[in-house]
Every structure is written in structure tokens, then in C-alpha cells.
Amino acid sequence: MDAAAEMQKVVSLRRGGGGSSSRGAASMWWSADNGVFSRSRASSSGEDGEDDEEALRWAALEKLPTYDRVRRAVLPVVEEGGGGGEAGKKVVDVLSLGPQERRALLERLVRVAEDDNERFLLKLKERIDRVGIDIPTIEVRFEHLEAEAEVRVGNSGLPTVLNSMTNKLEGAANALGILPNKKQTMPILHDVSGIVKPRRMTLLLGPPGSGKTTLLLALAGRLGKDIKFSGQVTYNGHQMEDFVPQRTAAYISQHDLHIGEMTVRETLSFSARCQGVGSRFDMLTELSRREKAANIKPDADIDAFMKASAMEGQETNLITDYILKILGLDICADTMVGDDMVRGISGGQRKRVTTGEMLVGPANALFMDEISTGLDSSTTFQIVKSLRQAIHILGGTAVISLLQPAPETYDLFDDIILLSDGQIVYQGPREGVLEFFELMGFKCPERKGVADFLQEVTSRKDQKQYWMQHDKPYRYVPVKDFASAFQSFHTGKSIANELATPFDKSKNHPAALTTSRYGVSAMELLKANIDREFLLMKRNSFVYIFRACQLMVVSAIAMTVFFRTKMHRDSVTDGVIFMGALFFSVMMIMFNGLSELPLTIFKLPVFFKQRDLLFFPAWTYTIPSWILKIPMSFIEVGGFVFMSYYVIGFDPSAGRFFKQYLLMLAINQMAAALFRFVGGAARNMIVANVFGSFMLLIFMVLGGFILVREKVKKWWIWGYWISPMMYAQNAISVNEFLGHSWDKVLNNSLSNETLGVQALRSRGVFPEAKWYWIGFGALLGFIMLFNGLFTLALTYLKPYGKSQPSVSEEELKEKQANINGNVLDVDTMASSTNLAIVDNTETSSEIADNSQPTQRGMVLPFAPLSLTFDNIKYSVDMPQEMKAHGIVEDRLELLKGVSGSFRPGVLTALMGVSGAGKTTLMDVLAGRKTGGYIEGNITISGYPKKQETFARVSGYCEQNDIHSPQVTVSESLLFSAWLRLPKDVDSNTRKMFIEEVMELVELKPLRDALVGLPGVNGLSTEQRKRLTIAVELVANPSIIFMDEPTSGLDARAAAIVMRTVRNTVDTGRTVVCTIHQPSIDIFEAFDELFLMKRGGEEIYVGPLGHQSSELIKYFEGIKGVSRIKDGYNPATWMLEVSTISQEQALGVDFCDIYRKSELFQRNKALIQELSTPPPGSSELYFPTKYSLSFLNQCLACLWKMHLSYWRNPPYNAIRLFFTTVIALLFGTIFWDLGGKTGKSQDLFNAMGSMYSAVLFIGVLNSQSVQPVVSVERTVFYRERAAGMYSAFPYAFGQVAIEFPYTLVQSIIYGIIVYSMIGFKWTAAKFFWYLFFMFFTFLYFTFYGMMAVGLTPSYHVASIVSSAFYGIWNLFSGFIIPRPKVPIWWRWYCWICPVAWTLYGLVASQFGDIMTPMDDGTPVKIFVENYFDFKHSWLGVVAVVIVAFTMLFAFLFGFAIMKLNFQKR
């Protein structure tokens, strides 16, 4: 075969895969971390016989053409039976490697990631270098980058209902040039220039808000349109337009977005499959060709690894297994990732999945944003070390931002970029950074991590403590001065010189920059998405089974309501009942499609992330989500039609039966496509619920059943022709009424038309057989249209927008001053309102030494209290999974008799590895456990602990900071203080106290900031932590528990939080913190340590001592324990030397050693002493359980709910807006029909307007209130546990706040619709109409709340509540009037709230009209005979409607009081 033909065949083998991302292959697939070459050498030097045999196999392999050779490898045959021995060698096709073979290969190459990865990568590099192949590299240059965002300043940025409306109008006026733009620009990056070199690890540091994420996004070519950006970023001298940056570089976000129902392995495999292999295949073919020419035989295992990693289209790739191993995810590879609803992996593991998702691809440059959040320092160290090996050996480019890098992790980096207030303060080699700051007059203290020092040295508050030129007075050095000084520093000069010389493009490797948009062919991407969608459908099978069952239940109800023995064919009225049954069937099939909304929306954040990373185009995602649902439609619709068709007594012809089934299939598919499109266009659950209900409403009302075609106004007739429901209703009606059952001619009929034709004409349906096929064809057209629109929406729309950023005026001034280099005076300086604390910047140990608790005397006095606990045991029922593994005990013990004491003015750290029981112990002591078995004694200052009184004197700062999202910081504190301080504290003292607390925790500049939802809007993680502490402090507690107060924070933020904690202790309070991996200075801010080991036992309880001397002395005194190195973090050392593996190595039990120590005896004596009440003391006593009276609790809860509702435009503004729109639509659709009473159809039309409004606006209220109540409920659990209020005042606040909003909604709707439809203008009739509408909207809202109260989450609530909407719809009296309902179902009409509403509305409007209709019957008599609605019953109806409202509200309150879905 000639070379050209051979290369042609090789290219075809790649199946359309990824153009020129050559370095991608070579670097990032390796850039994970395994690396073993320890065993691979052994395998190539076996016995002579084996060598000969292997040589023959290699010779045979060499003779193959390149096309076949790159697919085959020589591998050992693993013996069966798990012995692990080798039974000779064989040639295998790398595309068909099984999981066991892949595992065995990896095990030989990289047995232990920490030890073997580097050796493995060096082997790879050696093989590539041996034949002289260059690995592509990328140098990223950025020059004069400027970025700024438009923000609203002050209160105009708060998302109130009023602001949202005025801001929208203002935005429109700005766009038209009528009004000037009131937004101000906030600088994010300012004149940022630099170079990121290949084969070097760059660490990006900077305090929060310094612009790190923006810089990383700019370098990766991923900045959004909402940020104004200038400057240029080049890769190897090429502008961004010359290649595809999203595939050349990988940006790893700080947000973990994954599909919870997929396992870790499936998530990474899908990512690898979409990203393709880049240039690995090109490199491999060239490598193979050169080795053959040079007669070089590669190492068999390395050869197999490279070949298996270079093949596209594999469902599971060897690279995935390799990355899993390096990231330490192999232990949870087959565990679900999990989310709010599905239990899954831990937060730290989820963070690693986010990293792994990009590492499995072939990108050449990595930009990684805060990849260490939630990871302990040893895991972070291991991951960064593996990345470093890959970058150094295989020529990658990496910029990584980390929050609190430990000193050993910091030392792994080559270069540092320090960013502050959007300016580069330093960029260059790690070794030169301290020299630069010493020139500026600042020195890093000995026991301080350099990374922590760098984050703090530019900050206004922290700078002073590092000033070393004591002969000169200190003055604040602004960021601008640092930035300009760096320009004249030797490192800054050399970077400027290098930037002045353009990059030599001739050095650019052709494979370095990727020019193809996607990694593999479109068909391959479609296959990958089909496989994933099928997998998710299997995992979500419960939803589909539930949906099918729900349809069958509705079908069973429908067929017993429209029972064939009660269904006659004697008059046109009977035809109307049959048509009602058909309408109900169509409607239920339509409603069934609604469940596509949440299924679509929950997957969208992950979809948008993957689309923007160019994993796949939108159509490869939308087609599988449509096609794979078709078989489900067959089952769901089949169950419905097969059950009900003959029982209801539709036309018995088999042909008509199957035609109805076919039509129902089309309706089901059309509905699913419609709601997928609505979900894709709305991208937010609340908006989608409103928009989806709105679309359904328009299609229903204009579908020809609620309002007949002849009565549709000429200005709305277009709506009739484009409503899918019209085609469905017409087709299904024609199919039924043109059948043999309906072809009789009535004796009293004036025409020769059959009964079926007359029935069709009475409802405005075209009585021609062709309308079945017209309807069916139209539905197919709508299916295509909605699926097409869904695809377009997902192709072009951005993810749902976060709320408009808003900043305080002080914050903006400070930001601008820092960039301009101005020094702010103290009065306007946002961050320095609390000068007492600014001066308090000595190191923590100095604070501890100088502290005088009385000096910071808070406004309010409190009683210092101690807490002791003796022999505390805690156990839970043994989980079923553990019993399944053969464990016979009934209980699992989590705490095994721990004892200790916490004292006033002493700060205690509660530490231990994951699973040691830190949070469990804290929950037990604080009384926060909702289940399990507790034994042992707990005393408070010598008296037995009673939870009711203890809750009043203690505070608990939870790890996940739960607060009401729509209130400001100061309002959160005011609410907490109002409910928790004694009632004798007057409002002025309370305000002073809140001010003092805000100063203590440095929240004054944020007083008017909205709290927001974590990760979505509002406060940053660190600010939320401080708010959590402040919310507990304003209760003036004596004892405070804090769970992980510094997790997820950068070094500076952690220092601020610890300063807050220290200040709190110095006021004489008792404070206990669980803490994860603290830095030296955070660890040494504590006075005492309570150290636990896995299994819930204590191994050290005692003082830390100066520079942790007591702790070090204790552990070094244990025989065999290695001594601590100079400068090493005592916290890290202590955790390392006390692990279970260390215990086994030394043959000791640290718990036993502690219990035999003198320290233990001292602690026992202290517990004994503190467990005895001091003379003259008395037990804690409060006359009432809560500090406020019941009435005041109700007022406080109502005040907070008022703020929450006023600032929730997605709920309230949209609700009022859509009510107005629906009112105007109904007014124009049913224009002037209210006064017409000539025909029965006129009454049906008027009733149709009432029925539609009640059902649709009611369901809209019910569905949209659920997420709001659900968010507030999680806050309620925390606040109730803190003893702030009882359940009833909370329920009262949540219920009462709905009244004004629902009243406004009812008045808007009532006035518009009543006047436009033309009902009779009498005061009584109008107020009855308003009365019934108001209470109906209200009971629907309370029904939605009740559903949330009774279920664990609002997803479950929406499924449960939607089951009842269909039944209420059927028994409302519109589809089938009450007298026609079979006797066995008539009882339900009396307990159906919608039936009572329609009773009230129809009876109040028409029940007293004596005007005769066309056939001579007075309207009043027709209403009484046909509907059984009596005007004289209006008073009873009103009472029943109010009773339903009260019942649902009461059930919500009862559920909140009695049910607790929080498991602790």
C-alpha cells in the first residue's frame, strides 16, 4: 500500500474526529495523574521462552499496515479466577478492551498515583522524544486588559416588585434613547498584562472580588457579553478569531454543575466521548511510523495505553479510568454524583468531578478556578502535584486559582500572579515575590504561609501588621502604588520587554491550536447524547411509571364518571356530554405533558455548561430528548385509551378505536414538545410554570369547546386556527360522532341530519370526515414546530440570567479609589467603619494575650456559662445496606462515651478526620438532633441541661449558611434580635446592640446588601459566614457553637471570620468551633483543642500552648510518633500522625493512651468541678418558652414575609403581570358574552370564562407559590431550632402575606373581566364575583402551600398536587354537570372546591334572571335544572368557599408544626 493511500485510510479511521488539537492529546489526557512504571519494566524482561513468543507477536504486528497497527497492542493474558497471574501474551484490538483488561493495564502502569504517576509520564515522554516528535505547546499573552460591568448603585438595585417594573421600563427607555442610563460602571480589571508560559505552573492569588474569575474567563475566551472588555489575548501569537479557544483551552468553573442521576464514571466518560481525542491519533500514527522505520520496539504497556487513549468513539475510555485514579475518584467511580434530591458523593468529590470532566479532554491550556473548595489539604496537594507533573513533562500550560493553598501546595507552583482590585500587583517566579514586598516595606512573618500573606498584604485592614520599616511611620500603600512599583521591579521589566517582542509564529506547532468546532463527528455526538438520555430515562423510570399510573387512575375515574350505562344517545344534550368526555380526555393527555417542564429545566444548567464548552451542538441534545420519549407515549396513552374507550361507550368500531389511539399519541407528543419548548425558552421554573399555564390556557380557551367557533370574535379567530387543541378536539369529535352509533335521525328533528352531525354543529365542529386527517396532520406539524423551536431556543439563548448586580455607593467609591490610588478618608471608607477592629490587627495570639473581656463590654449584659458533658454516647438504627453486608447489630454507635468541658473566654477547636463525629457531637450538645439515641450527662454551669431554656442562651452557626434570601443584612439581624432578645430590651438599645455586632463582624458596609441565594446572587460565601455568626450573636448568647466557620473561604476571609470569633470569645462567651484543615495562624488562634478519631472517640483534650507547644509535647511523647519539622503546620502534623494507619503501624490506640494519661485525669477533675453549681447560683429559668409573646411573634414573622414578598418579582410581579394579561385576553375573547342568555350555549360560553379563569389562574397560583414556600421552610427549620418562634406564627406570616397580593390580583382580574365580558352591573353581582374570585385564588394558593408542607420537597409537592387538578377539573360541573354525574361519584362534587366556586359564580350571575330563553324556559329554571345551581344557596356556598380556604391554611400550619423533613 503506498504512503498516501495508507494515510488516507488512517484519516478515515478517525471518523470525523477533531481536526488539529494535537497538543490536546499529548498534554491533557496525560494531564491527570497516575503514573506507574514500576511493573511495566518487569513485564518486558520475562523468561526467554516468553521473550521469543512476544518477539514473534511484535514482528507480526510490525508487518501490519499503519491503519491496523495503531489499533492493536500486545497485552498479557490475565488468568481467570482472579489470581492475577499472567498466562502468556496476546495481540488485542484496543477498541475492545474490557473493564478488567483496562483495570489490569492501569494497575501495571500506575499502581499508586502518588508514587508512580511521574515515572509513567516520563516513560511516555521518553517514547515520544526517542523518535524526535515535538509536543505542541501554548504560550498565552495578555496585554492591557480592561473589564468593567454596569451596576445599579444603592437601593435601586434591590429586586423589589416596584424596582423590577421601573428598571424594566427604564431599560426600554435607555434603549430608545429617551432617558439617560442611570447605571454606573464598576471596574473589574484595569490595565492587566502578562505572559503565561508552557511547562510552568502558575498560581493565581487575590482577595475575593479582585477579578480572578474574570481574568481566567478572559484568558480562556469565555467572557460574557454583559462585561465590557478591551485589550488582547493571544495564543502563540494568534488572535482568538484564528482558532477555537473553547476547545484549545479548558476553563474549569468554580461551580459544580452535574447531572445527579449519573455516576462519576458515566459523567467523565460522556465528557471524554464528546471532547474526542484531539491530536492523539495523529501523533500516534506518526510515532508508529517513525518507530517502524527506526526499528524501535516500544514498551508494550505504554504502547497499549497510548493506542487505547487515541481511539475515538469509545463509550468508556482508558483516559477516564486514568483521570479517576489520579483525582482519587476511583473509590466512588460507580457512585451517583447526586444533587438536592439524590444522595451522592461528597462536596469535595463533586469538586474533583468538575476538574476531571475537563481533564479527560484534549485541551492544551488549563484555566482552573478555585478547584480546591471543600478538599482537605492533602487531596489538594496530590491533585496539584499530578497536574504539575503533567504540565512539566508533557508541556502543558496552566493557571490555577486556589483559595487557601497550604505551604506545601504553594511550593509546587513555578509562577505567581497576584491580583488585587483588578490590577496585577506581582507576576513572575514564586521565589521573587517576597523580595518584591520587602522592597515595598512589608515582610511575611515566620509562622505564616506565604499565600496567606500575599492575600492580606494589599488589604486596607490587614496591611499594617506586615509593615517592617519601623523607623518610618506606616501609611497605607494602595494597590495602584504596588502595581506601578512592580513595573520598575526587575521581574516586571523583563515581562514588559518580552511583551514588546512579538511571538515568533514560525515556532507555533500546527497541532497546538484547534480549529475544528467539535471534538468528534456530529453522528458520534448524537449517539453519545442518545446513550445518555436513555440512561437518564432508566434512572428516572419512577417519574415515567408514576406518570403512566397517574393517567390510568384518571382514566379509571373518567370511565366511571362517564359510565356507558349512564351515557345515552337520545338528544344533542347527550352529545354534549360525550363531547365533554372527549374534551376531558384530550385535556388530561395535554396536562400529562406538563411533567416535561421540570425534567427539562433541571437538566438545563448542565446543558448550557456543556454547550458553551462546545461538547456538542444543541440539536444533538434535543433530538434524543424527543425521539426516546415516543415509546413512553405508546405506553401512557395506550393505558388511558384501552381502559376507557369501551367502558365509556364510544363508537364500538375497531377502526375508530385505533384512530382515537393514534390521535391521542399525536396529542401527547405535541404536548410534550410544547412544554419542552416552554422549559427551554423560560429556563426558570417559576417563569416556566406561569408561561406553560398561559400557553395551555390560550390553547384550551380557543380550542372550540369552552367557546364555540361561531362565538369567537373576529379579532381572535386567528387564535382559533393556530390552537393545537382545536385540531385535536375537532379530529377526535369527528372520529366519534360520524360513527354508526350516531347515524340515527331524531323524530322531532327539523332536518335530515344525523344526531352525530347535529351534535357536532351545536359545538361549532366541522362535520366532515376529512377533519380527522386535517387534525392529525396539523398535530404532526405542531410536533415538528415545537421541537424545532426547542432546538432553536437551546441553540441561541443564554442560561437564565442572574439578578442584576447592585453595589453600595461606599463599595463602588472604594473600588474606584483603589484603582486610582486615592486614599479614602475614614468617614467614607466602607471597610473601616469599625476602627476598633482595624487597630486590632495583631496576630491572634497577641489578641489572646492582651484581651480584657470587659474592655469590649457589649451594650447588653449576659451571664457567662460553662458547659460540661460526661460519657456522651450517640447511636442510630443500623442502616439496611450495612445489615445486608452481614452486620448483625441493631444500632450503629457514632459517639463512644466522649467527655469534656467548654468554658467562658476559652476558644475551643473541635477537630478530627472526616467521619470522626465532630458535627454529631456538636448537634448532640446543642440539642439539634431530630433522631437517634443519646446517653450521658450534659450540664450548664452545674445544672442539668434543659433544651427549652438552653436554646435561649445558646447560638448555633450551621455549616450551610441558611437565611431568607430576599431580606438585607441589617433586616436579618433585626429579625433575629427582635425575636431572641428579652422583651424588656427597648428598641433603641436593640438597635445599638445590632450596630455593635455589625461592627464586631465587619458587616457595616454590607448593611443594605441583599442576602440572596448561595451561588446565585447576593452575598459571597465569606460574607454569608459572617452573617451567620452575626445572626447568632445578636441573640446575646452565652454559649456559641460554630460548624466549619472557615470552610470554602480564602485565607483573608478566613482570617476575618476568625477575628470575629476571637472578638466574640474575648467578650467572655463560651465558643466551640469544628474546623477542617486550618492554616497555622488560624489554628493557633484557638486556646484549647478537642481532637477526635474516626469512630467517635477523643484522643486529645487540652490546651494548645504557645505555638502549639503543649499539643506537640503530648504527641511527641508517644513512642514512635515522628517529630514535627520546623515551620510545619501543627494541625496538619497532628492529623497525619494520629491516623488509623499510623495507629496500626505503631501498634497503639491513641484513645487508650489519652485515657491513661495525666491530662485525662485533669480533665475529669475539671468536669467534676464544673458539674457542681457554684454557691449562690441558681438554675437557668425563663417564665415563657419564647422571649416574645405569641402576638409579637406573629407580627415579626409577618414583617419578614412582607419584605420577602415585596422583593420577589419572579413570583409576585410575574403573577400580577400574567393576571392582567389573562384578564385582557379573556375580556377580548369573551367580549360582551356575559349579557347574552338566549341559548344554552351562551350560558356555557359565559361559564367557560369563569371555569378557565378559576382553573388556570388557580393552578398558576398553586404551582408558583411552592418553590417560594420551600426555600423559606429550610430557613424556618433553623430559626425554630434556635427557639426564635413557634411554628404557628411562621405559618400565620406565610398565610397572611398572601391576602393583600391575592386581593390585588382578584381586583385587577375582576374589574377588567367583569366590565369587558359585560355581566350585569349591579353592586351585589359585582361583589359576589369579586368575593368568589378572591377566595378561589386564595384557596388554590393555600393548597399549593399545604402540598409543600406535607411533602419533603417542592418537586414531590408539584407532582402530588397536580394529581388533584385533573380530578377537580372533571368534577367542576363544566365538563359534566352535577345531575349527570353517576350517583357513586356525586359525593365528590360536594367536596370539590372548584365545583363550589362555579356554583357561586354561575348562581350569583344567572341564578336570579327570569328572562325566558329562546325555547321559553326562564334562565333561572334552566340553571336549576341543568346545573342544579340555586340562587338561594349563595350564602351556604360563600361559607363553604371560606371554609376550604381556612382548611388548606390550617393544614399548612399543622404540617409545618408536626412534620419535620430535616434529617439530622
Swiss-Prot record:
ATP 2 binds at residues 912-919. It is a multi-pass membrane protein. Keywords: ATP-binding, Membrane, Nucleotide-binding, Repeat, Transmembrane, Transmembrane helix, Transport. Residues 173-446, 867-1119 form the ABC transporter domain. Signal peptide: none annotated. InterPro entries: AAA+_ATPase, ABC2_TM, ABC_trans_N, ABC_transporter-like_ATP-bd, ABCG_dom, ABCG_PDR_1, ABCG_PDR_2, P-loop_NTPase. ATP 1 binds at residues 206-213. GO terms for molecular function: ABC-type transporter activity; ATP binding; ATP hydrolysis activity. Residues 1-26 are annotated as: Disordered. SUPFAM superfamilies: P-loop containing nucleoside triphosphate hydrolases. The chain crosses the membrane at residues 542-562, 575-595, 630-650, 662-682, 686-706, 715-735, 774-794, 1213-1233, 1243-1263, 1299-1319, 1326-1346, 1356-1376, 1387-1407, 1436-1456. Pfam families: ABC2_membrane (PF01061), ABC2_membrane_7 (PF19055), ABC_tran (PF00005), ABC_trans_N (PF14510), PDR_assoc (PF08370). Residues 524-737, 1192-1406 form the ABC transmembrane type-2 domain. Gene3D superfamilies: P-loop containing nucleotide triphosphate hydrolases (3.40.50.300). It is found in: Membrane. Its main location: membrane. PROSITE patterns: ABC_TRANSPORTER_2. CDD domains: ABCG_PDR_domain1, ABCG_PDR_domain2. Belongs to the ABC transporter superfamily. ABCG family. PDR (TC 3.A.1.205) subfamily. May be a general defense protein. This is ABC transporter G family member 35. The lineage of its organism: Eukaryota, Viridiplantae, Streptophyta, Embryophyta, Tracheophyta.
